[in-house]
Amino acid sequence: MTARIIDGAALSQRIREEVAQRVQALTAKGVRPGLAVVLVGDDPASQVYVRNKVAACEKAGLHSVKEQYPADLTEAQLLERIDALNRDPSIHGILVQLPLPRHMDAHKVIEAIAAEKDVDGFHISNAGLLMTGQPLFRPCTPYGVMKMLESEGVALRGAEAVIVGASNIVGKPMAMLLLQAGATITICNSKTRDLGAQTRRADVLVVATGKPGMIDGSMIKPGAVVIDVGINRGADGKLCGDVDMASAREVAGAISPVPGGVGPMTIAMLLVNTVEAAERAAA
């Protein structure tokens, strides 16, 4: 068996085209969706992510504002800037690129973003709405994973779904979305005993640990759908995921690649959330 590849790049392109149509409809009403991306410091990976997000916005016709500040910006100064963006009617979404410098409290900064502009879906109000099945914004990466599963026609109702990684950004919201779709959920973390015994039960396996090649083919149920959220640099300098692709694709039924899988979908769903924010503001 050789797993079919879930092409996140192609799916994200279709979603971006749909976003562009929605942007045109809003623009015709005098509303141009606007996203502000705030970057503090000079982390190279963050700069790449921000550049990709801004480029995607512009290509889809959204108004994008990139605000970059030095690493010695004070937390008070950042909060003041976020407050100004909250009050700016031309900005419908605000994204603060993580990680922040150590002298800043990331939770405090995220909570300062108006919930209706929190297009990352990290604000505690949006996390609570997601928990109760009434999400205002779904976090972009888990949202993208759900779209990938939908595109593959994966039957989630009654399926065994195992998530490796319990972060607030991916693991926990991923569990909520899969649970709401009718799947039976297991979340694994660094304390999980016999990880392979858990992952081999999964009809759907989502891996988000930041550890290259952590999951190999021996840990996968034959025919399972595997979504690799990880993005790492291997010893050879190339991008790789948390799943060992060579062995996994001989066992899985379908698998997302790295790169070209979840990454493009995360950006696509950020655009979707921003357009939804603009549509609500225009209603």
Swiss-Prot record:
Reaction it catalyzes: (6R)-5,10-methylene-5,6,7,8-tetrahydrofolate + NADP(+) = (6R)-5,10-methenyltetrahydrofolate + NADPH; (6R)-5,10-methenyltetrahydrofolate + H2O = (6R)-10-formyltetrahydrofolate + H(+)
CDD domains (UniProt xref): NAD_bind_m-THF_DH_Cyclohyd (cd01080)
Q: What is its EC number?
A: 1.5.1.5, 3.5.4.9
Per UniProt, what is one Pfam family of this protein? THF_DHG_CYH
PROSITE patterns under this entry? THF_DHG_CYH_1 (PS00766), THF_DHG_CYH_2 (PS00767)
Which of this chain's residues are annotated to bind NADP(+)? G165, A166, S167, S190, I231
| SUPFAM superfamilies documented for this protein | Aminoacid dehydrogenase-like, N-terminal domain, NAD(P)-binding Rossmann-fold domains
N-terminal signal peptide? none
* GO cellular-component term (any): cytosol
Q: What is a single molecular function from GO for this protein?
A: methylenetetrahydrofolate dehydrogenase (NADP+) activity
InterPro entries from the UniProt entry: Aminoacid_DH-like_N_sf (IPR046346), NAD(P)-bd_dom_sf (IPR036291), THF_DH/CycHdrlase (IPR000672), THF_DH/CycHdrlase_cat_dom (IPR020630), THF_DH/CycHdrlase_CS (IPR020867), THF_DH/CycHdrlase_NAD-bd_dom (IPR020631)
Q: Which NCBIfam families match?
A: PRK10792.1 (NF008058), PRK14186.1 (NF010783), PRK14189.1 (NF010786)
Q: How does it assemble?
A: Homodimer.
Name-wise, this protein is: Bifunctional protein FolD 1
